[in-house]
A protein has these predicted regions:
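NTP/phosphate- and nucleic-acid-binding module
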Residues: 1-35, 39-586
Length: 586
């Protein structure tokens, strides 16, 4: 998919088209007032106050028609520079623009505006030369958005759109968007019965249905078994803690905006935890440790809660409560490289076995100029960042450095993936931390009997299970590998009167093998039942008629398409082997 923020020409084109849309809206609704209209990864949007008018699907064609009329007129897009006083006078009737102007830096004495015909907007640019260049556009959708993202403010109307240089490119992109909608985990999750949301329960609080929780448990067991084979130990800690825990860790200072409000419980203050590391630090300090005990790899599938604005929530990809595939490796400085390599190796192994191919590595470093966000210790940061660079270079892994993206306590390696809709997301992470062990005064005894501070490696191979499931549903288009499918086999007798007994026999044999099987023997026509199973993306459908019953065979449909015939015994061996080997294909 194109990224309109990263391509300068597409950025300028979509920026200008946002102004074109605003101009058209102003023509149709003269009282309209405008907040901001930025370029985003998938095009642009503009937040608009239309008073009592609510934009509906029926209004979009009229706006597009007016946009085409303005574009055909071909006015030049002209930049002006005015003083702050002139800007305040120009936009005196628009409270949203006044707010932008008044919040500008005091040293910003010159303000830029862009005009096209009868429309002028505050803007830094860039833009194309004329509105005629914006003729190949499409308005995509509309929604509500709180002014400034604050739920206490008025809801503005947000209209999304996209613009491409040619009609052919626009049509191709719109086709990509349609395909992306089909891959969106929110659609697939509904079709497959993975999870549900309820406003009564709360926004961003997913509830996993039987199919979803089956998938969850399979992934959890898979990653836990991987960790056990690599010497991890698993623990369980509570999903909240005393506020002093987060003062000690520094989360309250550096991460408070992402935390839920503090709760008063009798004479103590508690908070829902946003991360698990403070609990694991305390757990490490429960015992005395020798260098012989290290590395100590403490892992947990842990429940966390983070405050996310309602506008940022997205299915189960971005939620307010989630379970993290977390681990903290306590090690000596000499063990950093081998442990870090072990984590990267595990990430690559898991991705290979799950068939995840499209990803990239990003090395997130601190911004040395930021004295607020990061723990201040230049020697520690330089050592940590160089260690991670050395490991990645030794492994021959291509990576991109991201300045200012590190955690407050240390640099990190993130694995980025592209979901069907929206921005890139982090799937896996590995972070080096010299800071938290010092904050919690953690120690181990070295071979000379001296007390030393361990290093901590934070890592999450699948990130959060919620996000991993969301991404994997999109990556596979819902066609999960057999071993991960909530329902692996659906048995469909053609006629219950004649074929149900044979169908029940097969169901029992499959259950004895540990295969998740359903009997689809409703009174509906066979074609309807098959379509039903196709929508649910059940990997294997067994259609049983007279021939299959009489010859003790089965007719398989694999992912609703390829058809095979086998004896019953051959099929039982086949499906068990595919399941046990965690095969990606059928």
């Amino acid at each position: 998919m194109l990224n309109f923020k990263e391509d300068e020409k597409l950025y300028n084109l979509n920026h200008s088209c946002a102004h074109l849309m605003a101009q058209a809206v102003k023509h149709l609704y003269p009282d309209a007032k405008f907040w901001v209209g930025p370029v985003i990864e998938t095009g642009f949007y503009y937040d608009i106050d239309l008073g009592d008018k609510v934009i509906t699907e029926e209004d979009i064609p009229a706006i597009e028609k007016e946009m085409k009329k303005i574009a055909k007129d071909g006015k030049r897009i002209v930049r002006h520079e005015i003083s702050k006083e002139e800007a305040l006078e120009m936009f005196k009737d628009d409270p949203y623009k006044l707010d932008l102007i008044e919040r500008m830096d005091e040293n910003e004495t010159v303000i830029s505006c862009y005009s096209q015909g009868d429309f002028t907007d505050l803007c830094r640019g860039g833009h194309v030369d004329t509105v005629k260049e914006c003729k190949n556009f499409k308005l995509l959708k509309f929604s509500g958005a709180y002014w400034k993202g604050d739920t206490n403010n008025k809801v503005l109307q947000r209209i999304y759109g996209v613009c491409l240089p040619t009609e052919e490119e626009l049509n191709a992109y719109l086709q990509e968007l349609e395909e992306a909608k089909e891959r969106d985990h929110r659609k697939i999750g509904k079709d497959l019965g993975i999870y549900m949301m309820s406003d009564l329960v709360g926004r961003g609080l997913p509830m996993y249905l039987p199919n979803g929780f089956t998938l969850w448990n399979l992934l959890e067991t898979y990653i836990r078994d991987k960790e056990i084979k690599r010497g991890y130990v698993h623990v369980q800690t509570p999903p909240l803690g005393n506020v002093n825990l987060y003062k000690t860790s520094g989360h309250l200072e550096h991460y408070k905006d992402a935390m839920f409000p503090i709760m008063q419980v009798e004479d103590e203050e508690y908070v829902l935890r946003p991360m698990n590391c403070p609990h694991h630090m305390v757990m490490y300090s429960n015992e005395l440790h020798s260098y012989r005990d290290l590395p100590l790899r403490i892992a947990e599938i842990a429940r966390d809660c983070r405050y996310e604005s309602s506008g940022s929530l997205k299915g189960i990809e971005r939620v307010r409560t989630f379970c993290q595939n977390d681990c903290h490796i306590f090690c000596t400085p000499e063990q950093i490289e081998s442990e870090f390599k072990g984590v990267v190796d595990l990430i690559l192994e898991v991705y290979r076995e799950l068939g995840i191919k499209n990803y990239k590595f990003e090395l997130s470093l601190r911004d040395p100029e930021d004295k607020v966000k990061y723990h201040q210790d230049d020697e520690m940061w330089n050592l940590a960042e160089n260690k991670l660079r050395d490991v990645l270079n030794d492994l021959g892994i291509d990576y991109e450095e991201k300045i200012g993206e590190a955690a407050f306590y240390g640099p990190k390696l993130d694995v980025q993936v592209q979901p069907a809709v929206g921005n890139e997301i982090t799937l896996s992470t590995c972070q080096l931390d010299f800071c938290l062990p010092m904050k919690f005064d953690l120690k181990y005894t070295d071979k000379d009997g001296e007390k030393k501070t361990p290093v901590v490696i934070h890592r999450a191979i699948l990130g959060t299970l919620d996000r991993a499931i969301a991404f994997y549903l999109e990556e596979t288009k819902g066609n999960l590998p057999l071993w991960l499918a909530p329902v692996q086999v659906s048995v469909l007798p053609v006629n219950n009167e004649y074929h149900l007994e044979y169908a029940n026999e097969i169901v029992e044999k499959l259950r004895e093998l540990g295969i998740r099987v359903q009997l689809n023997a409703s009174d509906e026509k066979l074609s309807y039942r098959m379509r039903e199973d196709q929508i649910k993306k059940i990997p294997i459908m067994l259609v049983l008629g007279n021939n299959e019953r009489d010859e003790r065979t089965v007719t398989l449909r694999l992912h609703g398409e390829e058809q095979k015939n086998m004896t019953l015994d051959e099929f039982l061996t086949y499906v068990k082997d595919k399941n046990d080997s965690k095969a990606l294909d059928l």
